[in-house]
Regions:
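Charged catalytic and DNA/RNA-contacting regions of genome-maintenance
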Residues: 2-273
Length: 277
């Protein structure tokens, strides 16, 4: 029997609630899934083991009488913020899965969906932020000639883009990264797995996030930017001809839409401008 068939059988053996959990978890394999159950966020399996260790909370299990009980742990939803902060500081991402129906008005399984993914560079809650510091999310894109750089402080809307060319482009980029000190850096999958990634970026492995190569498409990125700023070109922002920087900025926006979902609506990134290094 192949692995796919075994997984189907195992899924069918689970309760409807756990089937729902497993399905949602597959969509967020790199995040700790906070699965809302009543007044608690529950975590299961490997997520539970990691969370219990990082948060120093008790690890229990479901189906204790079975041969392979399911590890689990939980936290009260009304006091989740400090727990989320601790996980983020440890380099984790947290996917918040809420009940999207009123259990009192629903027969059977309550619908649930991930409403937001909290990452080191996309924290919006003032209680989780240092008010004395900027909170930059950076996106990088490269070709054989240069680097595209985009930086956004999601809490203020400050959005800067620039490019680096020439023999010292890697050094210039390194200086810029150190200046902005980003909480998170977005790279294309090709850059993460390829040989073009500068060695010094490896020191920031905990803050690196891999995104699909297509999210760095110049054409799509340009369209995203002019649609958001309601303009026909980017000349007024000083970056019309910055193809690498525009590609970086577009991937950054794609990442925000992917992680913030509805929470992105009140976030302003209206202050786009070419950044002088």
């Amino acid at each position: 029997m192949n692995n796919a068939a075994q997984n189907i059988i195992k899924l069918e053996e689970e309760t409807p609630m756990m089937q729902q959990y497993i399905t949602i978890k597959k969509e967020h394999p790199d995040s700790i899934l906070f699965f809302r159950m009543g007044d608690f966020y529950e975590m299961f399996n490997e997520d539970a083991k990691i969370a219990s260790r990082v948060l120093e909370i008790a690890l229990t299990s479901r189906n204790k009488n079975k041969a392979n009980p399911t590890p689990m742990c939980g936290i009260p939803h009304h006091s989740s913020k400090p727990y989320i902060a601790t996980l983020i500081k440890s380099g984790k991402k947290v996917a918040i899965c809420e009940q999207t129906e009123d259990p009192k008005l629903t027969k059977g399984l309550v619908k649930r969906e991930v409403v937001r993914v909290v990452t080191p560079g996309t924290i919006l809650d003032d209680n989780l932020l240092d008010p004395k510091q900027n909170h930059f999310l950076v996106s990088l894109y490269s070709n054989a000639k240069g680097w595209g750089f985009a930086a956004l402080d999601i809490t203020t809307g400050l959005f800067k883009v620039t490019e680096f060319y020439g023999d010292d482009r890697d050094l210039l980029l390194k200086d810029e990264i150190e200046k902005f000190d980003p909480k998170e850096i977005i790279l294309s999958e090709n850059l993460v797995t390829g040989c073009n990634k500068p060695k010094w970026l490896e020191d920031r492995d905990n803050s690196l996030q891999s995104c699909e190569d297509w999210t760095f498409s110049f054409k799509d990125s340009y369209r995203l930017l002019i649609e958001h700023f309601k303009t026909s070109s980017l000349e007024g922002f000083g970056c019309e001809d910055m193809k690498l920087a525009i590609s970086s900025a577009g991937a950054l926006i794609q990442y925000l839409h992917k992680t913030q979902k509805s929470a992105l609506e009140p976030v302003s990134y209206t202050h786009l401008r070419a950044h002088e290094t």
